[in-house]
Regions:
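Internal, conserved structured core segments that host functional sites
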Residues: 112-130
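Short, surface-exposed acidic-centric catalytic microdomains
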Residues: 40-81
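Active-site charged/polar residues at nucleotide-handling catalytic sites that mediate phosphoryl
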Residues: 106
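Short acidic/polar active-site loop segments enriched in Thr and Asp
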Residues: 109
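Short, hydrophobic/glycine-enriched beta-strand segments
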Residues: 21-27, 56
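Short N-terminal binding/cap micro-motifs at the start of the first secondary-structure element
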Residues: 30-37
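Divalent-metal-activated hydrolytic enzyme cores
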Residues: 2-12, 17, 62, 70-74, ...
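Short, well-ordered beta-to-alpha junction loops that form the rim of enzyme active sites
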Residues: 27, 114-117, 157
């Protein structure tokens, strides 16, 4: 896939096709797909639509998990399990592979993912004890996207203004 040059600033009549694509956790855009069948809408992320083509993805649903579904956490072994002990790692890996394929297909210049999710967390995740204890780490999809060369950020990065996702600012 060839490199595309994006306009430095959005102009009048800038169509969605002219905006650099950004993969986004669907729950951040208002889709009720989290494990509780709720959205985690982030207005700061939704506002990126003014300068970006937002491409929604829910890796957990894409991996075959239902909505709602039992909460899951990454265990110290690296497996993803529910509190009842069901191993759902394969579904998480299928969802991550789908997200990587989607990012490549649309030429995504980055991804904004749900913080602390076992799929999408990109700075920290829960430790696997189901006590809401946070540890440094990445979710399955965040790790796969980063390994594929796609920069990843959380909605908290966008909300805090620690990343500027204007066209041309990828990787900052």
């Amino acid at each position: 896939m060839g490199e595309r040059s994006w306009p430095a600033t959005p102009g009048e009549g800038w169509s969605a096709a002219d905006r650099p694509p950004l993969l986004v956790s669907a729950c951040l855009l208002g889709v009720a797909c989290n494990h509780e069948a709720r959205a985690n809408t982030s207005e700061a992320v939704v506002a990126l639509r003014r300068t970006r083509r937002l491409v929604p993805v829910c890796p957990e649903v894409a991996g075959g998990l239902p909505t709602p579904r039992p909460a899951a956490e990454i265990q110290p072994s690296g497996r993803v399990c529910t509190a009842a002990g069901d191993d759902v790692t394969d579904a998480y890996e299928r969802g991550a592979a789908h997200a990587v394929r989607l990012a490549r297909a649309v030429g995504a210049t980055g991804a904004v993912l749900k913080a602390r999710s076992p799929s999408c967390g990109c700075h920290e995740v829960y430790d696997g004890s189901f006590t809401r204890t946070r540890v440094p780490g990445e979710g399955v999809t965040a790790r796969a996207l980063r390994a594929a060369g796609v920069p990843v950020w959380s909605e908290e990065d966008v909300e805090a203004g620690t990343v500027d996702l204007q066209p041309g600012d990828e990787g900052r």
